[in-house]
């Protein structure tokens, strides 16, 4: 507990000139720029065909994630069968990457000592390979015995899918790491863009920088740091990005540079704050038709395919128990500091299940055609569905929910008809809003005000009975009245349409969602309990959810 965890993410194009005989990447002597710190001191050099070997030797990460594209596919024509699917493409690309690591040798020099071996021997036990969807036309080569085979590859897809698929995969993998490691003193993510091609570096960087702030906001802090600082502070989360100098021929010296170091969070300071979008509609769209690719693949069936993909998206939403309105309110609760509503709308869907099912259905809607010719094979891949922005919006909300619920002090907290204790709400504030000093102060003050007002009027209230917060504030008025902010009580009835008024919407947001007319309070078992009175009228829950997410951008 309280350890430092390092994750190395490496983006690669195709390392093979002719799979599996000759490499495209040259053997280089990798050295490190002065600003890079190595765990056991810098080696004199690392001789290898990839920066992965050098950075692994320097950083000693516990986890290694390699990101490749389906566009590096090569396939022996004799092994192609009629049922060859996109899942087979993924497995073949994973094998292509793994085979490179098994065959690529490396040499490390430290002082007068040398270490030689193969990259896979160093990283294999900690390796995850993510094969993200690409797009374009490619000519790849492979050797089958003494024969050279040309693989002409056409991949029809959306660049947005590379980003979305990668973010979902990284979210699931990173959550597994956080769950496995427990509380941390530091989480360091090292992003190596040296071997990325075309759009890969930019979209990978975007995926990582969109994901890390969500993790940083709610992650459990290690005990060692708490003791060292003398007070509870959050884990330090860093992102270091690397790039190397070009390698033009075997034997070139290439210096690896740290081109950026971003402290995503240190103490109460954020280099990047978490940001959320809300689903585009009450039923999130997790898959949409890729019209361009569908019309290329099946020009007379695009309409039918569109209905199929739309129905599949709806089935996914039902299967995963997702509600766009609740998810939007949850996003608003995180962004606007609404602790009671945050618990009331907390998703129950597991992120791992979500990622597995969404990406599985995405892959099932990829069509793979091939034709074998003399000394060549033509493979055409059509992504009939795409991953819209709703997919990302939901994934980030589920990730936030999972990390918040994983905190030991919140493991047994939930919203029910019995309400939530004030003690638990204060614990939630410490976790869910510690990334924003403003939200933490506001929510804590509002909870303190409820406690103060209750204690001031406790003689006239019966223990164990729910009382509207408005009645507690307006001690002179009958049940159902409420007091505006400031001055002497000027009470008015708590009407069903209270949130139709703009000033009451502002009051709801300014007072952490603890609106005097909507919150019920009771004291029981020595603690104060709160809940929403959504029974005031049937439209009230809808109104609360709509007001809660004011200011957030809708995914489109």
PLM feature spans:
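Short helix/strand-bridging catalytic loops that position acidic/His residues to coordinate divalent metals
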Residues: 188-192
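Acidic, metal-coordinating catalytic cores used for nucleic-acid/nucleotide bond scission
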Residues: 193-201
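Long, low-complexity, Lys/Arg-enriched
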Residues: 1-187, 203, 209-556
């Amino acid at each position: 507990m309280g350890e430092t965890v390092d994750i190395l993410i490496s983006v690669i194009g195709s390392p093979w000139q002719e799979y599996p005989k000759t490499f495209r990447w040259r053997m280089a002597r990798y050295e490190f720029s002065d600003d890079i710190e190595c765990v056991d001191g810098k080696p004199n050099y690392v001789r290898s065909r990839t920066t992965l070997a050098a950075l692994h030797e320097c950083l000693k990460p516990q986890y290694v994630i390699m990101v490749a594209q389906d566009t590096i596919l090569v396939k022996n024509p004799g092994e192609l069968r009629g049922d060859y699917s996109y899942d087979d493409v993924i497995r073949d690309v994973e094998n292509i990457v793994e085979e490179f690591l098994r065959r690529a040798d490396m040499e490390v020099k430290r002082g007068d000592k040398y270490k030689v071996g193969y990259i896979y021997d160093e990283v294999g036990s900690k390796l995850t390979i993510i094969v993200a969807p690409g797009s374009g036309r490619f000519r790849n080569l492979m050797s089958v015995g003494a024969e050279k085979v040309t693989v002409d590859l056409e991949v029809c897809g959306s660049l947005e899918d590379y980003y979305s698929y990668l973010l979902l995969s990284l979210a699931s993998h990173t959550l597994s790491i956080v769950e496995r490691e427990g509380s941390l003193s530091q989480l360091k993510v090292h992003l190596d863009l040296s071997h990325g091609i075309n759009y890969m570096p930019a979209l990978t960087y975007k995926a990582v920088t969109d994901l890390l702030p969500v993790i940083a906001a709610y992650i459990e802090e290690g005990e060692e740091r708490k003791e060292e600082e003398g007070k509870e502070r959050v884990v330090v989360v860093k992102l270091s990005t690397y790039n190397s100098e070009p390698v033009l021929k075997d034997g070139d010296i290439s210096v690896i540079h740290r081109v950026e170091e971003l402290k995503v969070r240190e103490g109460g300071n954020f280099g990047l704050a978490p940001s959320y979008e809300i689903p585009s509609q009450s039923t999130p769209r997790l898959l949409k038709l890729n019209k361009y690719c569908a019309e290329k693949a099946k020009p007379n069936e695009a309409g039918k395919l569109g209905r199929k993909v739309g129905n599949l998206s709806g089935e996914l939403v039902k299967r995963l128990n997702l509600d766009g309105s609740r998810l939007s309110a949850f996003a608003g609760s995180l962004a606007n500091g609404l602790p009671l509503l945050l618990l009331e709308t907390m998703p129950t869907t597991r992120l791992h299940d979500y990622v597995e099912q969404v990406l599985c259905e995405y892959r099932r809607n990829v069509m793979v055609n091939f034709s074998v010719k003399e000394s060549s094979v033509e493979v055409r891949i059509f992504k009939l569905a795409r991953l819209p922005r709703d997919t990302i919006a939901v994934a980030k909300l589920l990730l936030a929910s999972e990390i918040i619920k994983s905190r030991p002090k919140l493991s047994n907290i939930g919203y029910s008809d019995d309400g939530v204790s004030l003690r638990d709400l204060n614990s939630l504030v410490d976790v869910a809003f510690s990334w924003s000093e403003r939200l933490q102060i506001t929510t804590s003050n509002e909870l303190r005000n409820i406690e103060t007002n209750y204690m001031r009027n406790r003689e006239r209230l019966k223990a164990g009975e729910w009382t509207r917060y408005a009645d507690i504030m307006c001690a002179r008025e009958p049940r159902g009245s409420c007091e505006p902010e400031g001055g002497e009580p000027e009470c008015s009835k708590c009407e069903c349409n209270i949130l139709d008024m703009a000033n009451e919407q502002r009051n709801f947001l300014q007072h952490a969602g603890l609106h005097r007319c909507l919150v019920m309070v009771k004291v029981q078992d020595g603690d104060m309990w709160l809940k929403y009175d959504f029974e005031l009228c049937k439209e009230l829950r809808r109104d609360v959810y709509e007001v809660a997410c004011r200011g957030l951008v809708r995914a489109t």
